[in-house]
Design a protein with these regions (language model features):
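N-terminal positively charged helical leader segments and presequences
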Residues: 1-68, 120
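Fold-independent oxyanion-binding glycine-rich loops
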Residues: 7-8, 18-19, 41-42, 81-82, ...
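Active-site/ligand-binding-proximal alpha/beta "capping" segment
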Residues: 159-198, 202-209
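Glycine- and other small-residue-rich loops at beta-strand/loop junctions that grip anionic moieties
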Residues: 81, 115, 188, 212, ...
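Structured adenosyl-cofactor binding patch, chiefly the S-adenosyl-L-methionine
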Residues: 193-233
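RNA substrate-binding interface of SAM-dependent RNA methyltransferases
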Residues: 65, 69-161
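Generic structural signal for residues in well-ordered beta-strands
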Residues: 60, 138-142, 206
């Protein structure tokens, strides 16, 4: 069954959003009478029947709804510096949603090479990944946020940052799936020494993500995978 995203599944009759309707009509060529799945990204999944399909619009009647609790007992928040190439950051967002993440914050640091992001595009990537992986919760994606703003925000009990210098403990040695976690990943070139000192002052723990030097997006996904798997044990 094809899945579509619609933010409000309370009414019995649903008109698909424009982009979703275009996909249903022009790409999938769905017709009246076919059944579809609907996700609101907030834990509700519905089965619906298409009752009207025109050149530009799709109307569906809700047949059933199911509510799903949050997928993890503890939240995973990734704050990740944008990559120089936008497609790499989009790939990270796509895979993080598939693996399982609750919030993504594009992080501005001293060495961040990209000062602008199309958040609407990242949100579309996240929606597509949610549908592909058949998840029912869509992660929050923030606007570009400074390091100072992220670390000053009241947040998770566990606070980590990836660090390549010295011999910090591995993330998997410190992370506990019992409480929320915030993981910071710097840009290529890593955080500056001054930023690392600032993070230590705010009680962030430096962690290693392995012996190899990883790209920003690879490091972020490595951390996401470790934490997600730890919660499934």
């Amino acid at each position: 069954m094809h899945l579509f995203h619609c933010t409000d599944l309370a009414p019995d009759l649903i008109e698909l959003p424009r982009e979703e309707a275009h996909h249903a009509i022009a790409v999938l060529r769905l017709t009246t009478g076919q059944h579809i799945g609907l996700l609101d990204g907030k834990g509700t999944r519905a089965e619906a029947e298409l009752i009207e399909v025109t050149k530009r619009a799709c109307i569906a009647r809700i047949l059933s709804r199911t509510s799903h609790p949050p997928e993890r007992a503890a939240r995973i928040h990734l704050a990740v510096a944008p990559t120089k190439q936008m497609d790499r950051y989009e790939w990270f967002v796509e895979k993080a949603v598939e693996i399982g993440v609750d919030r993504i914050t594009p992080l501005i640091t001293e060495r961040t090479e990209r000062g602008k992001l199309r958040i609407d595009r990242l949100e579309r990537v996240a929606i597509a990944a949610m549908k592909q992986s058949q998840r029912t919760w869509l992660p929050r994606i923030d606007q570009l946020t400074s390091l100072q703003a992220v670390i000053a925000e009241p947040s998770a009990a566990q606070r980590y940052f990836g660090w390549c210098e010295g011999t910090p403990p591995a993330l998997m040695e410190l992370y506990s799936p019992a409480s929320d976690a915030l993981m910071l990943i710097g840009p290529e070139g890593d955080f500056t020494p001054a930023e690392a000192l600032l993070l230590n002052e705010y009680r962030f723990s430096a962690v290693s993500l392995g012996h190899a030097r990883l790209r920003t997006e690879t490091a972020a996904l490595t951390a996401c995978m470790w934490m997600s798997l730890a919660q499934q044990r």
